[in-house]
Amino acid sequence: MLATTPIDSIPDEFHRLMNGRLFNLLSWDQLTEFWAKINRDAGWYLYAVGEELPLVAAESGQVEKFIVEMDMLLRRDHDESYCGIVYADNLDNPSLIKIYDPNNLGSSCGSSKNPPLPGWIMSRVAPTGLQQKHALPASRKRWWQNLFNQD
């Protein structure tokens, strides 16, 4: 008799990447070098977890603006001598980047039984919804909603 797996239990490509092996960008210098390697034209979906799923990949100008604004937010709100809250599946040619919100870290390394979800995800694979346990703070919601409306 063959064992079968219910179709609902087979992870999609996005969840496979989300739950796969990730590498941490420990220093601010590493993060700066990493941002420079990101191909802005690679078809990135920009997703604020808890907000609406992006239906199309962002344009290169939107990706550039996201990276610049995200870098400023992280450096301002994560007032530490190290970064340590950005993870990627590949540090030279990533398909998925998890960015943890400095104001909702919990245990982002996954050592707790209920690690928090990242605040933002950059993915070259269309994301599927992730359920936040808590509502997105109003300040983060405003930041996200205004990100591309300031042009």
Language-model features: where?
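Polybasic, proline/glycine-rich intrinsically disordered low-complexity segments
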Residues: L22-L26, Q30-L31, I38, P94-D151
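N-terminal "first-domain core" detector
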Residues: M1-E51
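Generic detector of well-ordered alpha-helical segments enriched in charged/polar residues
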Residues: P11, H15, T32, V63-D71, ...
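Non-membrane alpha-helical secondary structure
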Residues: L2, P6, F23, L55-Q62, ...
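Canonical SH2 domain fold
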Residues: I67, L74, Y82-D89, P94-P102
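Short, surface-exposed beta-edge/turn micro-motifs
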Residues: D41-W44, E80-G84
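Short linear motifs in intrinsically disordered
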Residues: E33-K37, M72-H78, A88
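Compact, well-ordered interaction domains used in eukaryotic information-processing assemblies
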Residues: V49-Y82
